[in-house]
Amino acid sequence: VNSGAHTAIEPGILYFGTPVVLVSSTNEDGSANLAPMSSAFWLGWRAVLGLGVRSRTAQNLLRTREGVLNLPSESMAPAVDRLALTTGSDPVPAGKLARGYFHVADKFGRAGLTPVASSTVAPPRVAECPVAMEVVVEAVHPVGDDGGVVAFEVRVQRVLVHESVRMAGTEDRIDPDAWRPLIMSFQKFYGLGAQVHPSTLASIPERLYRGPDIERARRVPAV
């Protein structure tokens, strides 16, 4: 273990490594938008998503209050990268224009991905993503003082997965040795390696974490 001295630095971004999420949402004209992001984390059956408030995804979530969180595997990096520097907003917001963004109406076509109908929300899922979570917006929290960023608190209504990532012999568990999420760290794509050390925390049965949002999700009818 390196016990060297720390040095104070001021990175422009603090993206130390989180899963990439392809957020699908519904545009005002009823078409589907698809946008990659990685400022996301989960607490039980809820997720917190950090988005620029002027982005098309944020505007769609604010208007419709629903979306899908599609989690790509590491093998899907080329498809995700085809969405880089694209926006569903037309005209392109000034801040994105300065960074080289351009408008694309058909994000699924641009990425070469397949939309499939969702169970409980209007936006489609991404067929190729091993994990998809249909969500509704429960709360929106401002971040910072300039109003440019918001944190969406979303509640999961359905979790849908490919059989390839389910743990054998179980109904409701993901196999972490089979699931290989695409990770973004400081704007670059990475995957996960093998487990590096046995986990004491993993001795706790997952069923002990099941909260009331799961029962609530069961009562949501299919659309």
Stretches found by the model and what they are:
Residues V1-V223:
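Basic, polyanion-binding surface patches
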